[in-house]
From Swiss-Prot:
One of its GO terms (molecular function) is ATP binding. It is found in: Nucleus membrane; Cytoplasm, Cytoskeleton, Spindle; Cytoplasm, Cytoskeleton, Spindle pole; Cytoplasm, Cytoskeleton, Phragmoplast. It is an enzyme of class 2 (transferase). Interacts with TPX2. Residues 31-282 form the Protein kinase domain. This is Serine/threonine-protein kinase Aurora-1. ATP binds at L37, G38, R39, G40, K41, F42, G43, H44, V45, K60. It comes from Arabidopsis thaliana. The keyword Metal-binding does not apply. Phosphorylates specifically 'Ser-10' of histone H3 in vitro and colocalizes with phosphorylated histone H3 during mitosis. Associates with cytoskeletal structures that are necessary for cytokinesis and with the microtubule spindle. Also colocalizes with gamma-tubulin and function in microtubule organizing centers (MTOCs). In contrast with the mammalian B-type Aurora, AUR1 has no kinase activity toward 'Ser-28' of histone H3. The keyword Cell division applies. Abundant in roots, flowers and flower buds, low or absent in expanded leaves, stems and siliques. The modification Phosphothreonine is found at T185.
Length: 294
């Protein structure tokens, strides 16, 4: 399939920025800083332009003192190490990083249409066509990650951005691991945790299949499937896979079938990601371009 000229231009810009990042040591004076794009627990994200190339990026500014207080320096180093080596259209690029006495700066790809979470809040829930397009895009990105021995472990709406063309981008690799074996640590977001992580037993890449199933449900219904008033009830519902499909909104049997095949307690029995892409609901609803056009 031919790539549009605009996409080629964007990819060349991204490639140039990445090559430049690898060749030099950045400082804040290399950038014109623009409007704030968002704020997080450890700092802020700004729109920025690299002066020499005129390339527009998102500059994530993190305060060292806050990272140290929360003991997440190791997590940040891991995020930088993993994300800087990933090259996929549905994964936000990390071009490089630099630091000064007080702050750490991450030079990130700019996703012009912003946070998916805000879109979901505004719409309440997505159409099956939109949900399927996003789920298929994420499945392809996760297949790529798993092929590189990277497990994300924290797929959720808050960690997804939308690019200028409407393509989905995985944006946060703070909980991801580069692994060749099974792990036992608990991480990620409660509503999205699979049974094996709730029960603190070994887990592998199939945790991302579970999280993608939760995400698909939330796209279609507007809430995660095991949500409850008390944490203990959420834990119980996850472990028992207490999966219920409300009567409203009306969702196709095919969509429910896909979700049911992903949200399986025995991790080895979850629908593999390559099979997900062949599922009738994905085939019939997902835009093959991976781009949802509003």
């Amino acid at each position: 399939m031919a790539i549009p000229t605009e996409t080629q231009h964007q990819e060349k810009e991204a490639s140039d920025a990445s090559a430049a990042a690898a060749q030099k040591r950045w400082t804040l004076s290399d950038f014109d800083i623009g409007k704030p794009l968002g704020r997080g627990k450890f700092g802020h994200v700004y729109l920025a332009r690299e002066k020499r190339s005129n390339h527009v990026v998102a500059l994530k500014v993190l305060f060292k003192s806050q990272l140290q207080q929360s003991q997440v320096e190791h997590q940040l180093r891991r995020e930088v190490e993993i994300q800087s080596h990933l090259r996929h259209p549905n994964i936000l690029r990390l071009y490089g990083y630099f630091y000064d006495q007080k702050r750490v700066y991450l030079i990130l790809e700019y996703a012009a249409r912003g946070e998916l979470y805000k879109d979901l809040q505004k719409c309440k829930y997505f159409s099956e066509r939109r949900a399927a397009t996003y789920v298929a895009s994420l499945a392809r990105a996760l297949i790529y990650c798993h092929g590189k021995h990277v497990i994300h472990r924290d797929i959720k709406p808050e960690n997804l951005l939308i690019g200028a063309q409407g393509e989905l981008k995985i944006a946060d690799f703070g909980w991801s691991v580069h692994t060749f074996n099974r792990r036992r640590t608990m991480c990620g977001t409660l509503d999205y945790l699979p049974p094996e992580m709730v029960e603190s037993v070994e887990h592998d890449a199939s945790v991302d299949i579970w999280s993608l199933g939760i995400l698909c449900y939330e796209f279609l219904y507007g809430v995660p499937p095991f949500e409850a008033m008390e944490h203990s009830d959420t834990y119980r519902r996850i472990v028992q896979v207490d999966l219920k499909f409300p009567p409203k909104p009306i969702i196709s049997a095919s969509a429910k079938d896909l979700i049911s095949q992903m949200l399986v307690k025995e991790s080895s029995q979850r629908l593999p990601l390559h099979k997900l892409l062949e599922h009738p609901w994905i085939v019939q609803n997902a835009d093959p371009s991976g781009i949802y056009r509003v």
